[in-house]
């Protein structure tokens, strides 16, 4: 603001005391703008709005500022002095206003070129911010220099698209170097790059073809080698079989000779020595095998008796019956060796099954069943998963108690003890009791102990709980009935009735007394 006022003060020629004006400005701190600073002529975009202000300042005319807008007293004094001097008459002077002239064609062209350069610079800066240092060149001549080369690449490309011959992709365009400013360099670079790319692609394709050929040759060589090895192995295998057979025969002959020599050399053992040797053998087997030692010794004894080990598979009663039925149907088809293979049993065992007439008793079967249960507890236990159906017990319909049932029983027992002499009355009472028992039979749905043992506590916990609650309630009701009956009987002990007529009279008297 200070500079602006100083510049404009030089244009005012009619001010006599310029020193006073400048000293006041230097000593005062202005807090309010008197006039707005106009923009320079070469940058101004709003010339029309600021034209009047510029003309007034150039001609020495300053707009008066009201006192209310000023902030300090010093500014007020300064503005008063200026207003007094401005009101004084003005000498006529030549206008320093520049005369406007029409620009020539050369000037217009220069301005247009400068504007275009500025726009291009701005666009380049924006593109550099988006794409980095490398900026794509979109000149008009780009489609001409690489047209032939690009068509050749298009024809060689396997993944080409039909109808896209004239289309130029961004990847095909070269990147400008900022250092190369000449147009000749710009046109010469892309041609060299396209040729180099084309040659590189051809070289890569040739290398791939060579590698494929080498790979195929390697596979052929490996296949041929494997065939030769297989043939060689087959020949060796046949030769080895023949040699092995000969060697085995020789080995067996030598073994038999050695065994014969050893048998001859071994001395005969006495009974005591045999028992001692047997004990030693049993001790060794027990140390090595533990619990399985008894089974192994049992098999050794069978081997001595029968000359064979124990069978591979044990046969059940149902299997034995099936063997007999099959042999009866077709003895020519279901022969002993066929059955031995199917059931995995020795020939001697099948012959025993077919010719035996022994049938076990119930005691024997009971013992066998116990052994099965002890050996296979998981299979035969009531808690197993397979026996869930057996554990099922219904308690949906529980027994109901009738009070008359217990009262009639107890009354009849007392009457029989008291009235032994009256046979007729006793007979009538017994007949009545039989009829009442048939009507009111007490049949509680009690679970037997055999079923209770089978119940799984995890699945049938609630069922057992209901049963226990039912049993407890039943005992409570019985106790209540007994107590009530004793009260009634104590009252009746004092009365000794001889006949039914006297009994009725006594009952009526009791009711009246109550």
Swiss-Prot record:
Residues 193-214, 252-279 have a biased composition (Basic and acidic residues). Residues 176-186, 240-251, 402-434 have a biased composition (Low complexity). Residues 120-132 have a biased composition (Acidic residues). Transmembrane segments: none annotated. Disulfide bonds: none annotated. Residues 192-296, 398-429, 462-511 form a coiled coil. Belongs to the neugrin family. This is Putative neugrin-like protein DDB_G0288135. It comes from Dictyostelium discoideum (Social amoeba).
């Amino acid at each position: 603001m200070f500079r602006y006022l100083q510049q404009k003060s030089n244009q005012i020629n009619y001010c006599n005391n310029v020193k006073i004006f400048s000293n006041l400005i230097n000593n005062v701190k202005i807090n309010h703008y008197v006039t707005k600073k106009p923009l320079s002529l070469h940058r101004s975009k709003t010339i029309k709005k600021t034209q009047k202000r510029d003309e007034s300042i150039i001609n020495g005319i300053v707009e008066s500022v009201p006192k209310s807008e000023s902030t300090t007293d010093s500014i007020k004094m300064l503005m008063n002095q200026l207003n007094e001097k401005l009101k004084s008459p003005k000498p006529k002077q030549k206008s320093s206003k520049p005369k406007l002239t029409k620009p020539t064609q050369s000037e217009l062209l220069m301005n247009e070129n400068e504007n275009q350069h500025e726009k291009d610079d701005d666009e380049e800066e924006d593109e550099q911010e988006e794409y980095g240092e490398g900026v794509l060149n979109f000149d008009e001549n780009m489609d001409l220099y690489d047209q032939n080369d690009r068509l050749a690449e298009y024809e060689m490309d396997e993944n080409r698209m039909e109808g896209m011959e004239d289309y130029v992709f961004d990847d095909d365009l070269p990147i400008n170097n900022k250092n190369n400013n000449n147009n000749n360099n710009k046109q010469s670079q892309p041609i060299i790059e396209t040729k180099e790319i084309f040659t590189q692609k051809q070289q890569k394709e040739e290398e791939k073809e060579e590698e494929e050929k080498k790979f195929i040759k390697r596979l052929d060589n490996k296949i041929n080698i494997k065939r030769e090895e297989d043939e060689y192995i087959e020949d060796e295998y046949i030769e080895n079989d023949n040699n092995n057979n000969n060697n085995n025969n020789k080995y067996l002959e030598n073994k038999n000779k050695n065994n014969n020599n050893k048998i001859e050399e071994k001395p005969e053992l006495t009974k005591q020595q045999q028992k001692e040797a047997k004990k030693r053998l049993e001790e060794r087997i027990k140390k090595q095998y533990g619990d399985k030692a008894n089974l192994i010794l049992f098999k050794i004894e069978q081997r001595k008796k029968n000359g064979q080990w124990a069978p591979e598979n044990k046969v059940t009663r149902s299997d034995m019956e099936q063997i007999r039925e099959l042999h009866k149907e077709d003895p020519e088809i279901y022969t002993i060796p066929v059955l031995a293979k199917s059931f995995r049993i020795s020939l001697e065992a099948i012959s025993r099954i077919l010719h035996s007439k022994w049938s076990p008793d119930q005691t024997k079967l009971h013992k066998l069943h116990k052994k099965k249960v002890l050996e296979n507890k998981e299979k035969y236990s009531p808690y197993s998963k397979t026996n869930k159906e057996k554990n099922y017990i219904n308690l949906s319909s529980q027994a109901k108690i009738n009070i008359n049932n217990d009262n009639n029983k107890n009354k009849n027992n007392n009457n029989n003890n008291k009235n032994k002499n009256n046979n007729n009355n006793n007979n009538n009472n017994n007949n009545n009791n039989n009829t009442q028992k048939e009507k009111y039979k007490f049949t509680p749905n009690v679970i037997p102990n055999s079923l209770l043992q089978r119940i799984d506590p995890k699945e049938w916990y609630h069922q057992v709980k209901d049963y226990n609650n039912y049993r407890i309630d039943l005992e409570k009701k019985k106790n209540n009935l007994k107590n009530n009956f004793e009260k009634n009987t104590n009252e009746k002990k004092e009365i000794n009735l001889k006949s039914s007529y006297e009994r009725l009279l006594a009952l009526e008297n009791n009711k009246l007394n109550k």
